[in-house]
Amino acid sequence: MERPPPRAAGRDPSALRAEAPWLRAEGPGPRAAPVTVPTPPQGSSVGGGFAGLEFARPQESEPRASDLGAPRTWTGAAAGPRTPSAHIPVPAQRATPGKARLDEVMAAAALTSLSTSPLLLGAPVAAFSPEPGLEPWKEALVRPPGSYSSSSNSGDWGWDLASDQSSPSTPSPPLPPEAAHFLFGEPTLRKRKSPAQVMFQCLWKSCGKVLSTASAMQRHIRLVHLGRQAEPEQSDGEEDFYYTELDVGVDTLTDGLSSLTPVSPTASMPPAFPRLELPELLEPPALPSPLRPPAPPLPPPPVLSTVANPQSCHSDRVYQGCLTPARLEPQPTEVGACPPALSSRIGVTLRKPRGDAKKCRKVYGMERRDLWCTACRWKKACQRFLD
């Protein structure tokens, strides 16, 4: 009994594509493996209708050739199983992901360094590790600090932090105030010399002490003359009547006096002041009444001679002379001692001390306060003796 011939040999290929969808015409998608349809043997066939056909299952999309760096090849089902490979091909020109990070680390280290030139051009200090999978930034972290190095296509450079730390820079000297003013824009404080210095003189009889502050003078009067131990807050202000202000010129002190320390009474009047010779002032009848010199010329105290000017000395001594009840006619010999004081009073013009405005206190004294005007009692400008 003869078997029928195989149907596959004489069938239409379109019918085969209808029964096997994977054998249809391929579109733009991934291609399937080629189909091998061998010629049936001339003898009797052993299998069924599809015994002589070998069909391959659709292959998955292969990796792109750009990633593998190999020519475009396709493998069919007849090629056999793929052999495992221990080597993964990596393109040589591929940029390392840690290069940018290493550059940032090196830039930050160079900026924070105190060295003048942290970039040292020369041979590479160390190369990258040949181990696969070790990135350059990891290698930089493994190295000890201060031995960073990098190699790129453009050139090699390295930087040793330990060499920079071993030679610190020499500290610069401090800037003068003038240079700091120009660099930082800070206003420099100018030292202004005051044209006159205000001093305070005690008006207590035979005291004449001169101090630089009003609080010190008030404390002196309160403790020494008034015998009070009260604090300034509890005081009634009586010590204000026992001292006056003195205007002492800086130029006068520097020219006429050697220093501001107390000296002996022999150096009370400085010889450097100019002397003005006026004939009408040398005559005794022409002298005004408030400028009459006292009969016994009192030597000024040593403390007063160091800081007070001749004008203040003369005015205070004349005031003490006017308080004497007896009127003395000026003698020719005594008039000769007055021209230096008179010439100094005319030549040196300073502002009026504060104590000159309180006339009632100077005329009547502290013992006869009942004769004072109301303004003087309330420590105001005197209204009785106007200048």
Curated annotation (Swiss-Prot):
Gene Ontology biological process terms from the UniProt entry: regulation of DNA-templated transcription; regulation of transcription by RNA polymerase II
A GO MF term: zinc ion binding
Expression tissues: According to PubMed:14630949, expressed in heart, skeletal muscle, liver, kidney and pancreas; undetectable in lung, placenta or brain. According to PubMed:14625278, ubiquitously expressed, with lowest expression in brain and ileum.
Subcellular location: Cytoplasm; Nucleus
Residue window of motif Nuclear export signal: 253-263
Modified residues (Phosphoserine): S264, S268
Name by which UniProt lists this protein: SLC2A4 regulator
Taxonomic source organism: Homo sapiens (Human)
